[in-house]
Structure formats: structure tokens, C-alpha cells
């Protein structure tokens, strides 16, 4: 057996495996792993320090302590390899076998495995169908359980207390059998006939109707089936044999001073062995039952503590009062095996140092200190020295390097040439946090970094440190050069815009260089080309900013990549002409003929990349940087105290504000305004004053008046240093300048409320003590916020990466016709994001037709690049259906067409690109820039809430979407449908503005009419909701009895009387069943029918409705019958920033969410209960109606008798994404989440491409619930991977069988990560114990599809360059399968993977 095992173990080393299976280990399997039984609790001998025989470190069981040397020293050296010493019984072999050889302990009494007992839901409990409490009482020897009933009235699995047991013994004698402890449970588990039980339960499931019972049965059936399929036996959840971890994985290390440091596991094992031996002795002595029982209970507790300390009862503590670390603690958590050693490892050949600026470097270079390079590249240097024959041995080479001989430096230069190194700055938030550079040797001890890559690293030079890594193999060097070189990462993968963008000094230099100055020296000169411009500037004949005319040559790039020269004479400035020298051929002069700010420079680089490609852009970026630095130095811009000019008007403005505040205070004291109003008004006054001061200050700073050539005064933009820095985008902002030279303004208290006394001083004047104290609040809160934000943002990124890590581009085209309809994002009168930006880089899902014709403009499956987008704009197309990851039909992964352009490269995405991780990084990386706070609505926000009209901004044509309306007696259009959209469309058919119009709004202009800008097109009363009639006739009151269902009120001011409907709660008992309504009848007293239906026009009135009509009056369609007052929903705080993004991705249901109509039909109300009313929707086609209970305090948007469509809003509130998915489908929920997430990022000015969010949504929609299983193998109500249902249904379709029906589920990212197919990935994310328990019972197989699983098992990931490797591997396996030539000495892959799964199963694979 031993030899066979050795053979097996040597095989698993090199055997290539495809999947990993985890299952329960049988006692025989545990014994087969073992090399001997551990019988004694001793570890090592205190005198000789040699392991004790049969102890926890026994050399005979686990192998020799020293390489090739037995314990007694009889056999030493390699020549005795494989000999077993007859004296000490130790095999002569390498000592590293002590890391892999296991032992075992034969338990004298079975013990339950705590994971299967206590990890909820308890597997043992579910199998036996007994409550966990009862099982625990049996296991810990408090009660008996009946095993054999015999001819008694006891039931099997019945729990008996000590008394009941003794009574039954007296009554029935030996007829029945009841015991306690793990033996009893083991017996019961053995007794289960899985298949038979399963069939019984299935029959029961079909017969029951109770929902809870069905759920419980389904759970049991699933568990039983998983046991049947995985060939696990239930009794294996009870241990008879305990495996012992190899000793080198729980080491005992001698410390100085004769003490030992030991792993906690040794203590835990010692307790188990001690108790086990004692129990053995007691059983041999046939000790009294009560003593044996106690000992068995203690053994059970010791085993529990070893497996998972602290899961049951108090954790066992060591000598220093801290809980001992059990086996379960070894693998879970941040310090556990998964996250500490398998997903992240320490790296050899690396160093770290402080970074400084390298302004003279090229973009692909970094400065590496000589000392560091020498250390990092040592092996290469040794090798070179030996090859050259300069050193005879490695030892000699080592000496030479240590002495730092001159020749060593020459060789270092050679070694380093074209050998890229990787630079990494922590935290690595996205893939640009590690880039490759070619090292340049420098003196000093700091790494030099190229300034343009700082943005990608988020680095600055205030003491940041960076790590250097050396790629050793040729392949890794190739990857570093081809994929990770900084010159290949010009565009950001998050939004496809350049990330190599100059900032700060460079921007200031270029801004200064391209500014104009009126009447500068040399104005009006005519110059021939840039060289002459530079000459006159250098000679001092002309100033940098003077306006001159220059003759330049522009080059236009043709289709065939050649250039056409165009000569022009252009009015410009000297500086711009000089800058033109570095602009690459193919860009127009207009690009520099403007004052360049940061945005313009970014645009310039982007244009360059799109027109001229990567190489030119890299060269251009370097030139921009050198020029910018040079001219920033020439500009001599600096910050002096006199640059901060305080406006003269400031004192007046503040005085006026103080007078206004005093007035309000008087009004408050005389009781004209409330405290709240006073506070709000005071804050508004100061906010306005602050704005005025800021405006005056900016006017002052930004312009200066100069004398022009003709001798007149003229205003020009100022050359004030502080203004230039802010205006160019180099540093600072108007808000900061305002605090320097204006006034600091209002400050907030720590709880977010605003302090009403503002700081009127600015930093130039200086703050007094009180003002300084007030401003410390904000500063401190900012620091605390930042710390919290970093942690939260990091956790969000981790969850996102985990949910999306296995999403890789796996095929070119999945051929789906599905897609998302993209429209420009319009809110109110503003286009927030034009269509062009939303579809750029996507693939069209269907042909795009030129409007009003049948001609195809763009074919299906075209990647929309900049040129196509220009075409779209030219033809004024305002909606495009594009392919999306959410609709992709690929089973595992996505296809390239559904993803579209790889944003970091600008072409169609390649196969093997890990788009999931890229998406997660793009969303998580800006997380630290988002705010943490929830916004409190006050001041401005509450005023905007009560909108009552729509005023358009652009002229155009009105277009009403899904609108129903009637014309009232005044000839105006009245809206009678919900969720109406009003769009303003320009002459080209493009939507310019979009508004929501409420029910009952009166339109000034109708559908299709022209409007001018500033015109008001719709009005409504924001405080009441009208009930509008759609027919003409006479009003008839129904059930409106004074004092019972209505009361009459007279208005004090007008004297008009009105009728108010009483709420049911306020009515007397006699009026409870009355249902007040207004009926419309014709002059003969017959009911008027609503047009197009056979329903009488009857309008039921809700409580609190106000009617201002009399019985029998004539009314016409569009008139208001009654008004229902709308309570203004009190101010709610909106969650913003990071928490909002987390809520959306976790798919949390909001509080007080909107109620949506589940089906289409007619609304009516059924019988009410105390706090709820019953809403009934009856479909028009006569199918089953739908009922829902709604709390009475909810405001409803619908009246009785109204028609709603599925998914319409019945009661307002934040919508739940789950409802949107269920009622409106995948498209709608995608649109909702994308827009909501983008809203948060847009507020912070962060650009993220929509497709990244869609990638995460695809992963959230991974699961589906089976509605009807039909001919498939699924259970009804079971949650299954969507891809499995798709594959299964395809198979059933082929066989002409009935496929399963299903509904898609939306899971939050945490849930989705834990519900993934791969148990390795789930276990390494969170809740390790639960995941492993579940997987072991079900005998799960991990196909190793994702990236994480492959990293953990130590393989290349199936993405990027590893994608090809895995493909090749699969092909090889296919070939092997097709023509198997297995010799008898080989073992099959199945056996090998089985033995591997056994190793893994006991959580023992260390590396």
C-alpha cells in the first residue's frame, strides 16, 4: 500500500489537471493518506530535542528531521536513500517530506465534525430532519435518541431525557434501543436510504400546497440528491479517524533562551490525544458509564476546538488568554491561507525606494539607483562575469561584485540594456499601477520617475515610495515590453481618454506660452516660419505674447498615409509659433492657435493619437513636457502676497448683508417669521454675499486695462500669477482663490448643519481666534472622512473584482440581435451626455437607416469609431441600438462584438482580454474621489422641489410620449395619463430637452406644435392632484352623505363652500361601507360610457379629496371634478457618493420603495384592513386579477377605474431594481443601474464608460429561478446559473422536448460572488467555512474557469497571454482523448485528480 501511495504522490506532482473536486473523506481514505498513527501527545524530548517516538513530531511516521539522515544516525548521506533504519524505523529521505506526510489518530469514540453540525443550515440536522438543538443535546450527552423502536409506542429519532429513558426501560425492557453521543447520530445517518427517502419526499412535494413546507422539502431533496450524486455517505460527517497535519506545517521553533514557539495546532492536537488515550483506558477498564460519558463529551469538545475553535461555546484559550488558532482559522480571513499565501505572495528580485522627479527622462525610461540595480541584477552579473572568464566560479564573481570593481559597473550597464523593470506604487487601484520602464542608471538613492506617468500612478513627490520588480524570464520580459511598457498605456482603460496628460508646471508653461498680450513688443511683425519667430524672441526683438503674422506649412494626412503640404499666413503669437515646432506632421495649426489650458492639451493628445497613432503621440507627449517645463521656468510665475488682490467692494457687500440679517432678526423677534425660516434666510443672505464678493474679486483678478497701439485703454486677461495658475488648470480653482482673497464664507458643524455666522475674513487678511476655531471643524472632518473613504472604496473594489473576475472575452461574435437602445442623456433642458459619447466604441446591433429614407447608413456589427460618430451627428440620428455585454449569448465569458472597443487600445477587444477585472478596477479606482456624505436637503434644494411649470430653453417642436389627453372647455390640452414625457425636438429630429409631465397638467401647446425658447408649455398645481373627467355630461353624487362620508367646509376668504370626503378612519360606523364617487350621466339619467370601453364613467374619490361642484351640474371633458391634496413628502436625505454606488451594486431594496403595477389592467379597491388597503388590478382580457395590500399612509398616483400597464408606478418612491427587472425586463434594469451609477460619478467629474457598469450588471444577472421545470432536470423554484438553463434548454429543443421556463434574478455583488460556480473563488472571498462545507457535501467540481481559481492552484490565468496556453492545453487533451495510448504504468487523469481532491479536501494543500 505504501509503495502504491508513494507512486500516486509522485504522479500528482506533474499530472496536468482540469478540475478540482472537493468531497467528504471516508475513514478509509484518511487512513490511506496516513503514514502511521500518532499515539502520544509528546512533541520533542526536552534534553535531546529529538522528536519523541509515536508523538506529534515522530520521525518514523513523518520522515527524517535532517536530509538523508535517520534519527539515530546509523544511516547518513545520499547513498542510503530509501533505506528504512531497523533501529529507529525512520526512512532515509529528504526532510521536506515532513511537509507532506500526514498521520492519523484512531478515535476511541466517534465524534461529529463541527462544520457539518454548526455551519448553518446544519447538514446533519437537515438530513435527519431533526432540530439542531436536539442533535446537540444528543451529541453532548444530555439526552438519548431512539434508534430502534421495536414493538413500542416510541418513535424513531425521538429524544428522551434521562428520566424518560429510565421510565421507558422499565416499561419496555430490551424491546427498544436508545443511546446518546455521536455513535447514535452516526447510526441514524447510516440508516438513511438516500434514494428511497428522496422519492418519498418528491411524492410529498407534489402533494403539499403550503409554501413553507414546500421550501423545506425542496431543501432536503436538494441535499439528498447532492449526497447521491457525489457518492458521499452521510455517516462520513461523523469522524472515526482524525487526520494529523504534517509537522512542518505546525512547526515547533526553538527560541533563544531555551523556550519554544509553537503553532497553536500542536496544543489542540495534544488535548485530543490526551483525552482520546484517557478514554481508551477508561473503556478498557470498563469504567462507570457517567465517567465514560464525560470523557466522550470532552473528546468531542477537543475535536471541535481543533477543527473550528469558538464555533460552539467559549473558545479554548492558550497560556496568554487568547483563543487558539484552529484549522478553520488557518484558511479563513485576510491572514488565512487563501488571501495571505495563495492570492498574494512575496516577490523575489524586488526593491523599493523614494521617488523623485526625472524631467529629462523619455516616457519609456525611469532612473534606477546604481546600488539598487547592482543588487537586483546580481545573478545576471555573476553569469556575465563567468561567461567572459573574468571570474572562475560564482563565489569569485560574488567577491568581485562585493568589492565593486570597475569592470562590474560596465557589465551592469550591459545587463541592464533593454531589460525592462516593473515599477509599482501601492495602492495599485487599476492596472496602470504597475508599468514597465527601461532603467537608466543614476547616482543617488531615489528612483526617478517620468512626470507624465504620475497621473496613472496617482503619485507625487512628497515622499511617496515605489517598488521595483525585475522580470527574469524571456517571456516575462517580452510581456513587460509589449504590454506593460508605459508607452503602450497612453489611454485610460476606464474611459478611453489619454491618461498621459501634462499637469501643473507643464500646463502653466504652455498656457503662458500661448497667451496673447495687447501692444507687446514687436506687435504686427511678419515672420517666415517658427524658426524666425524663435530667433526674434531669443534676440529680444519681440515678446513671447506679441501678436504677429507667421507663414507656416500645415500637413494634411491622406487616406494612403502620405501628407499634403498647405502653406498659410496666420495671425498668431510668437509663443504659439514656437510651440508649432514640436507639433507632429498631420495636425492642423488651429490646434495651437489658442490659449491652451489643461483640457485643450488633453484634446490635442487625443486628436494626435486618433490621427497619427501611438508612436507619434509618445514622442509628442515628451516634447510637450520638455517645452512646458522650459517655458514655465521662463515665465517666472510665483505666488506673492500682493497677487491676492482683495476687492474694494468687499466691505460694502458685507455691511449690506449684516443690515439684512439684522432686519430678519427683528422680524423674528416680533414673531413674523419662524426660527427655521429665519435660519434659512440668514444662510441664503450670506451665501449670496459670498457669491458677490467672489465675483468682484474674480473680475478684479482676471482683467487688467492696458494702453493699446492706438493709445486707447483696453481690457485684457490679466497676467496675475495666481489667476494664471487657476485659469490654465495647473493648480487651484476659483473656490480656493475666493478663500485667499474674497471671504471664506459659511462653515459647517461636524454634524453637517451650517453655522449661520460666516467667516468674513480671508486668508490674506488672516482669521481671528473664533474664525479659526470654526474652520477647524471642517478641516478635521475632511481628514476623518478621507480615512473612512479609503477603506470603504477598497472594499467596494474587492467585491467588484471578485464578482467579475471570471469574465473574459472568449469568442468573436455570439450572433445575437439583442442590444440596448442608446439615446442622448437629457435631464430637463440640458444634454448631460450626447449620443456620440455614449455609442463611441460600441458595435451596432442592427442596420442604421438614414431618417425618412430606406437607405442603410451604417451596417449591423460595425464598430462605431470617431468617423462613424461624425456621420451619425451629420445625419442627426438620435437613437442607436448597440450590442451590449448584458445581452451577450456566449455561455462562458462574452464575445468581442458585444463588448466593442478595447478602450485602452482603441481597436476591437482581443480574445482573452480580462474585461471583468478591468471593469471592476475602472469603477473602483475613482472610489476614493467620491464623497461619503449623505446630502441634507435644505435651502436651494427644497425650493426646487415644488416645480409647477415647464419652461423650454431651445426652440423646436413638442413631442409627447405615451400621452393620453383631452381638450377642456377652454380649448386647452389636459394630460390624463401617467409618466408622460415631453421632448423638444430640433429641425434635424434630435431631442434637445426632455421633461416629465404629471397627470392633470394643462398644456399651452399641443403635440407637434412649435415653441420658442423661454416659452412656458405646461402648468400644474404641485400641491394637489386633480381628478379629471374624460366625458361630457351631468355630475351625479353617489354615496356622498353629509356627516357620514363627507363634510362641507366654507372658505373664509372667498365664502365658497366645498365638500371634503372623509377618510374611512374618520367616519362613523354607519358610513364605513359608503364609497363616495362622482358619476357622469346624460340628460336622460343614463350612464355615460368611457370612450372605447363598456365601463360607465364613475370616479371614486379617495379620502381628503375636495369637490367644488354641486350635484347635477353640467361638465365637459377635461374639467376638474375634484382635487386630492398631495402631502409634500418631508425632506428626505439623498444618499450620495460611495454609499450610493455600493447600494446600487448590492441591489439593495430602498426603504419606502415605489409600488409598481404587477400586471396591466383596471384598478379597483377591495376590502380594507386596519392599516392597509387592498389594491386589485383586473386585466382587460378576463384573466386572473392581482391583489396587493398597500399601507394606508402611502400616497397613490392612481384612482379607481383607471387603466395601468405592467410596471407603471402606483405609488411614488425610489424604485427597487428587483421590481424593475421583474416587471420591465433586463433592458430597463440595466438602464436604471447604469444611469444611477453614472449620476454619482458625473457629480464628481469622473468619466467612466457605460460598458464597465454593464459588465458588472451581467454578473449580477448570472442566476435565474426555474418557474416550470417541464422536461428538464431542474427543481421548480431552484436558483440556477443562467448559462446552465440556456445550455439545458438548447439540448431539450434539439430533442424536441419542453424546455424549462425561468425568471432572471438580480443578485447583489457580494451574493453573486458567493453564488459563483467555482467554490475556490467563493471560499477565498468571504464566509470560507460555509462555502467549503456546502461544496464538500455536494461533492462540487471546480472547472477552474475564472482567474482567481487558477491563481490559487498556481497556474497561468485563462486571460491575456495565458489564454493561448490554456487553449493549447485543452487541444492537447482533446487529442489525447481522441487517440488514447495509455501504458499500464501511467495513471489516468481522473485518478490523479481524485487523489488531488483528497489532498485538497482536507484543506492541506499548502502551496
Swiss-Prot record:
GO terms for cellular component: DNA-directed RNA polymerase complex. It is an enzyme of class 2 (transferase). Mg(2+) binds at residues 460, 462, 464. Zn(2+) 2 binds at residues 814, 888, 895, 898. The keyword rRNA-binding does not apply. Belongs to the RNA polymerase beta' chain family. This is DNA-directed RNA polymerase subunit beta'. The lineage of its organism: Bacteria, Pseudomonadati, Pseudomonadota, Gammaproteobacteria, Enterobacterales.
Amino acid at each position: 500500500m505504501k509503495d502504491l501511495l508513494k507512486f500516486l504522490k509522485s504522479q500528482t506532482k506533474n499530472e496536468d489537471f482540469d478540475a478540482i473536486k472537493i468531497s467528504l473523506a471516508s475513514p478509509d481514505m484518511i487512513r490511506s493518506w496516513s503514514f502511521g498513527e500518532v499515539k502520544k501527545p509528546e512533541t520533542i524530548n526536552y534534553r535531546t530535542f529529538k522528536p519523541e517516538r509515536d508523538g506529534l513530531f515522530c520521525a518514523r511516521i513523518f520522515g527524517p528531521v535532517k536530509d538523508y539522515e535517520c534519527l539515530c544516525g546509523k544511516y547518513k548521506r545520499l547513498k542510503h536513500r530509501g533505506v528504512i533504519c531497523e533501529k529507529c524505523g525512520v526512512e532515509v529521505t529528504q526532510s521536506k517530506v515532513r511537509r507532506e506526510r500526514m498521520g492519523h489518530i484512531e478515535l476511541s469514540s466517534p465524534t461529529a465534525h463541527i462544520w457539518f453540525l454548526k455551519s448553518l443550515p446544519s447538514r446533519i440536522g437537515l438530513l435527519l430532519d431533526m432540530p439542531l438543538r436536539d442533535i446537540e443535546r444528543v451529541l453532548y450527552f444530555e439526552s438519548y435518541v431512539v434508534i430502534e423502536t421495536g414493538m413500542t409506542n416510541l418513535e424513531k429519532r425521538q429524544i428522551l431525557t434521562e428520566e424518560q429513558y429510565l421510565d421507558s426501560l422499565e416499561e419496555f425492557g430490551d424491546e427498544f434501543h436508545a443511546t446518546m453521543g455521536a455513535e447514535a447520530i452516526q447510526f441514524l445517518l447510516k440508516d438513511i436510504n438516500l434514494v428511497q427517502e428522496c422519492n418519498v419526499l418528491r411524492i410529498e412535494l407534489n402533494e403539499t400546497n403550503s409554501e413553507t413546507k414546500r421550501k423545506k422539502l425542496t431543501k432536503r431533496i436538494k441535499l439528498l440528491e447532492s449526497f447521491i450524486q457525489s457518492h458521499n455517505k452521510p455517516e462520513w460527517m461523523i469522524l472515526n479517524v482524525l487526520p494529523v497535519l504534517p509537522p512542518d506545517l505546525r512547526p515547533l521553533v526553538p527560541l533563544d533562551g531555551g523556550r519554544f514557539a509553537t503553532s497553536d495546532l500542536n496544543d489542540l492536537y495534544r488535548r485530543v490525544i490526551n483525552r482520546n488515550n484517557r478514554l481508551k483506558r477508561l473503556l478498557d477498564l470498563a469504567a462507570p458509564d457517567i465517567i465514560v460519558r464525560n470523557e466522550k463529551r470532552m473528546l468531542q469538545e477537543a475535536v471541535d476546538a481543533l477543527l473550528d475553535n469558538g464555533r460552539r461555546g467559549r473558545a479554548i484559550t492558550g497560556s496568554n488568554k487568547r483563543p487558539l488558532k484552529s484549522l478553520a482559522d488557518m484558511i479563513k480571513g485576510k491572514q488565512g491561507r487563501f488571501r495571505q499565501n495563495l492570492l498574494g505572495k512575496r516577490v523575489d528580485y524586488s526593491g523599493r525606494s523614494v521617488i523623485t522627479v526625472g524631467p529629462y527622462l523619455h516616457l519609456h525610461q525611469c532612473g534606477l539607483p546604481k546600488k539598487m540595480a547592482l543588487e537586483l541584477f546580481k545573478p545576471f552579473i555573476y553569469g556575465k562575469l563567468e561567461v567572459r572568464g573574468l571570474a572562475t566560479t560564482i563565489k569569485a564573481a560574488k567577491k568581485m561584485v562585493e568589492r565593486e570593481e570597475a569592470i562590474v559597473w560596465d557589465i551592469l550597464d550591459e545587463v541592464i540594456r533593454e531589460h525592462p523593470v516593473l515599477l509599482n506604487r501601492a495602492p495599485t487601484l487599476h492596472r496602470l499601477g504597475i508599468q514597465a520602464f527601461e532603467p537608466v542608471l543614476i547616482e543617488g538613492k531615489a528612483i526617478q520617475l517620468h512626470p507624465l506617468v504620475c497621473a496613472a500612478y496617482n503619485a507625487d513627490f512628497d515622499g511617496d515610495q515605489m517598488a521595483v520588480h525585475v522580470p527574469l524570464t524571456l517571456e516575462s520580459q517580452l510581456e513587460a515590453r509589449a504590454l506593460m511598457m508605459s508607452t503602450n498605456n497612453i489611454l485610460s482603460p476606464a474611459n478611453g481618454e489619454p491618461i498621459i496628460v501634462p499637469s501643473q508646471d507643464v500646463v502653466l508653461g504652455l498656457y503662458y506660452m500661448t497667451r496673447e498680450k495687447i501692444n507687446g513688443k514687436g506687435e504686427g511683425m511678419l515672420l517666415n516660419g517658427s524658426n524666425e519667430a524663435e530667433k526674434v524672441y531669443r534676440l529680444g526683438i519681440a515678446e513671447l505674447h506679441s501678436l504677429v503674422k507667421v507663414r507656416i506649412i500645415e500637413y494634411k494626412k491622406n487616406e494612403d498615409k502620405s501628407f499634403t503640404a498647405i502653406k498659410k499666413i496666420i495671425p498668431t503669437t510668437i509663443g504659439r509659433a514656437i510651440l508649432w515646432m514640436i507639433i507632429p506632421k498631420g495636425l492642423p495649426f488651429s490646434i495651437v492657435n489658442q490659449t491652451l489650458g489643461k483640457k485643450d492639451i488633453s484634446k490635442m493628445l487625443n486628436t494626435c493619437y486618433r490621427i497619427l497613432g501611438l508612436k507619434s503621440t509618445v514622442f509628442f507627449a515628451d516634447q510637450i513636457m520638455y517645452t512646458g517645463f522650459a517655458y514655465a521656468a521662463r515665465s517666472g510665475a510665483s505666488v506673492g502676497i500682493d497677487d491676492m488682490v482683495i476687492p474694494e467692494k468687499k466691505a460694502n457687500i458685507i455691511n449690506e448683508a449684516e443690515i439684512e440679517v439684522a432686519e430678519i432678526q427683528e422680524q423674528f423677534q416680533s414673531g413674523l417669521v419662524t426660527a427655521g425660516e429665519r435660519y434659512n434666510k440668514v444662510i441664503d443672505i450670506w451665501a449670496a454675499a459670498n457669491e458677490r464678493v467672489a465675483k468682484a474679486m474674480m473680475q478684479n483678478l482676471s482683467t487688467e486695462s492696458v494702453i493699446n497701439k492706438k493709445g486707447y485703454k483696453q481690457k485684457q486677461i490679466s497676467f496675475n500669477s495666481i489667476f494664471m495658475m487657476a485659469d490654465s488648470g495647473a493648480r487651484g480653482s476659483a473656490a480656493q482663490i475666493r478663500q485667499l482673497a474674497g471671504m471664506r464664507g459659511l462653515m459647517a458643524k461636524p454634524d453637517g448643519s451650517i453655522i449661520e455666522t460666516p467667516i468674513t475674513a480671508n486668508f490674506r487678511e488672516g482669521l481671528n481666534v473664533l474664525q479659526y476655531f470654526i474652520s477647524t471643524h471642517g478641516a478635521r472632518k475632511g481628514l476623518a472622512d478621507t480615512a473612512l473613504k479609503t477603506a470603504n472604496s477598497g472594499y467596494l473594489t474587492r467585491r467588484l473584482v471578485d464578482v467579475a473576475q471570471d469574465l473574459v472575452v472568449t469568442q468573436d461574435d455570439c450572433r445575437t440581435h439583442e442590444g440596448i437602445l442608446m439615446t442622448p442623456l437629457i435631464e430637463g433642458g440640458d444634454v448631460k451626455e450626447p449620443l456620440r459619447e455614449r455609442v463611441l466604441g460600441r458595435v451596432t446591433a442592427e442596420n442604421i437607416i438614414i431618417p425618412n429614407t430606406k437607405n442603410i447608413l451604417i451596417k449591423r456589427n460595425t464598430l462605431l469609431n470617431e468617423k462613424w460618430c461624425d456621420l451619425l451627428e451629420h445625419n442627426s440620428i438620435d437613437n442607436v441600438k448597440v450590442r451590449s455585454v448584458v445581452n451577450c449569448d456566449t455561455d462562458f465569458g462574452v464575445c468581442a462584438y458585444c463588448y466593442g472597443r478595447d478602450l485602452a487600445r482603441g481597436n476591437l477587444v482581443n480574445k482573452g482580454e480580462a474585461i471583468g477585472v478591468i471593469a471592476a478596477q475602472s469603477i473602483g479606482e475613482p472610489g476614493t474621489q467620491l464623497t461619503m456624505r449623505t446630502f441634507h436637503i435644505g435651502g436651494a434644494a427644497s425650493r426646487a422641489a415644488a416645480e409647477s411649470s415647464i419652461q423650454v430653453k431651445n426652440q423646436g417642436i413638442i413631442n409627447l410620449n405615451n400621452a393620453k389627453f383631452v381638450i377642456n372647455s377652454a380649448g386647452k390640452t389636459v394630460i390624463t395619463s401617467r409618466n408622460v414625457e415631453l421632448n423638444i425636438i430640433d429641425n434635424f429630429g434630435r431631442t434637445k430637452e426632455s421633461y416629465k409631465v404629471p397627470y392633470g397638467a394643462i398644456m399651452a401647446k399641443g403635440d407637434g406644435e412649435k415653441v420658442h425658447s423661454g416659452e412656458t408649455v405646461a402648468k400644474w398645481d404641485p400641491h394637489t392632484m386633480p381628478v379629471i373627467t374624460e366625458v361630457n355630461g351631468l355630475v351625479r353624487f353617489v354615496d356622498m352623505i353629509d356627516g357620514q362620508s363627507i363634510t362641507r367646509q366654507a372658505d373664509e376668504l372667498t365664502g365658497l363652500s366645498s365638500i371634503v370626503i372623509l377618510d374611512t378612519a374618520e367616519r362613523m360606523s354607519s358610513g364605513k361601507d359608503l364609497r363616495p364617487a362622482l358619476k357622469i350621466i346624460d340628460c336622460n339619467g343614463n350612464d355615460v360610457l368611457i370612450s372605447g370601453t363598456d365601463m360607465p364613467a364613475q370616479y371614486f374619490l379617495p379620502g381628503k379629496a375636495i369637490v367644488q361642484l354641486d350635484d347635477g351640474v353640467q361638465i365637459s371633458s377635461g374639467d376638474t371634478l375634484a382635487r386630492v391634496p398631495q402631502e409634500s413628502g418631508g425632506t428626505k436625505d439623498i444618499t450620495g457618493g460611495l454609499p450610493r454606488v455600493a447600494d446600487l451594486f448590492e441591489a439593495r431594496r430602498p426603504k419606502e420603495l415605489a409600488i409598481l403595477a404587477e400586471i396591466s389592467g383596471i384598478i379597483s379597491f377591495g376590502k380594507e384592513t386596519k392599516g392597509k388597503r387592498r389594491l386589485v388590478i383586473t386585466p382587460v382580457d378576463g384573466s386572473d386579477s392581482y391583489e396587493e395590500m398597500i399601507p394606508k399612509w402611502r400616497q397613490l398616483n392612481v384612482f379607481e377605474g383607471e387603466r395601468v400597464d405592467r410596471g407603471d408606478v402606483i405609488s411614488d418612491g425610489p424604485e427597487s431594481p428587483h421590481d424593475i427587472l421583474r416587471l420591465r425586463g433586463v433592458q430597463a434594469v440595466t438602464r436604471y443601474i447604469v444611469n444611477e451609477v453614472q449620476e454619482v460619478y458625473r457629480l464628481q467629474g469622473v468619466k467612466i464608460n457605460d460598458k464597465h457598469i454593464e459588465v458588472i450588471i451581467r454578473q449580477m444577472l448570472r442566476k435565474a429561478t426555474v418557474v416550470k421545470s417541464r422536461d428538464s432536470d431542474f427543481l421548480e423554484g431552484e436558483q440556477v446559473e443562467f448559462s446552465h438553463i440556456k445550455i439545458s434548454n438548447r439540448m431539450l429543443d434539439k430533442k424536441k422536448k419542453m424546455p424549462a421556463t425561468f425568471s432572471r434574478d438580480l443578485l447583489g455583488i457580494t451574493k453573486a460572488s458567493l453564488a459563483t460556480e467555482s467554490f475556490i473563488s467563493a471560499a477565498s472571498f468571504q464566509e470560507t467555512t460555509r462555502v467549503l462545507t456546502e461544496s464538500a457535501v455536494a461533492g462540487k467540481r471546480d472547472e477552474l474557469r475564472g482567474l482567481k481559481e487558477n491563481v490559487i492552484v498556481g497556474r497561468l490565468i485563462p486571460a491575456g497571454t495565458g489564454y493561448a496556453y490554456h487553449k493549447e492545453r485543452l487541444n492537447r487533451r482533446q487529442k489525447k482523448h481522441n487517440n488514447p495510448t495509455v501504458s499500464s504504468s501511467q495513471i489516468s487523469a481522473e485518478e490523479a485528480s481524485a487523489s488531488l481532491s483528497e489532498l485538497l479536501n482536507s484543506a492541506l494543500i499548502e502551496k
